Design a protein with these regions (language model features):
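Membrane-embedded alpha-helical bundles that constitute the cytochrome b-like, heme-associated redox core
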Residues: 1-221
Length: 221
């Protein structure tokens, strides 16, 4: 006999599915902006400690043209959707009590190691599973912090004069760009792992993020 278990509230599902295309557009438009100046410099004053750049063949292979204006327009337009959706998600999570399922507790870091071993088939026994497992709680909470980092570094880059104090906190304009870039790389890596986990866990888990309930098997007496 099949059972239905409530999994994700409607608001959480809306935030999730709004953020998905918006973040993809933000990453793509960010690549268009980055292509205009792919050099990152880390230094103190005029002294350069490190330079990093993505070589042109990468962009040539992906057929990314010089479309700086288009990239800036898309990035600055969709950043408002990204920011508003993210802030609304955090506020909802706090006031609805959903944070209790999301924020890691003192057991999460130990249990997350068990989750990784189980996913790699190095451990047969399934780790403790609540609404989110320990690895999910850590990674989803990290994504929220990364979102905050994106907004703050983005402001430091977008308005380095008006938010000079913020740009200074990140170590200057180039360092803010550097952090912004690597946070974006983190999003891409998270996205790859997230999709792989969705495929691994199957249709029922994916469907729960659409309709809000998970279909399971009733336990016998």
């Amino acid at each position: 006999m099949k059972t239905l278990e409530k999994k994700h509230p409607l608001a959480i599902r809306w935030f999730h599915w709004i953020n998905f295309p918006v973040l993809l557009i933000m990453v793509w438009s960010g690549l268009l902006i980055y292509w205009a100046n792919p050099v990152y410099r880390i230094g103190v004053g005029k002294h350069t400690l490190m330079k990093m750049t993505v070589k042109e063949p990468v962009y040539e292979k992906w057929h990314i043209a010089f479309r700086l204006g288009e990239g800036i327009s898309l990035h600055f337009f969709f950043m408002w959707f990204f920011a508003i959706n993210g802030i609304a998600y955090v506020l909802y999570t706090i006031f609805s009590g959903e944070w209790r399922y999301l924020v890691p507790d003192r057991r999460s870091f130990k249990e997350s190691f068990l989750v990784v071993l189980h996913d790699l088939r190095l451990r047969k026994e399934a780790p403790p599973q609540r609404k989110y497992n320990a690895a999910q709680r850590i990674s989803y909470s990290a994504i929220i912090l990364m979102g905050l980092g994106s907004l703050l570094t983005g402001l430091a880059i977008y308005k380095p004069v008006q938010f000079a104090w913020l740009t200074w906190l990140f170590g200057g304009y180039q360092m803010a760009r550097f952090f912004h870039f690597w946070i974006t790389v983190g999003y891409v890596l998270f996205f790859v792992v997230h999709i792989a986990q969705v495929i691994k866990t199957g249709w029922s888990n994916f469907r729960a993020m659409i309709i809000g309930v998970e279909v399971g098997e009733a336990r016998g007496d």
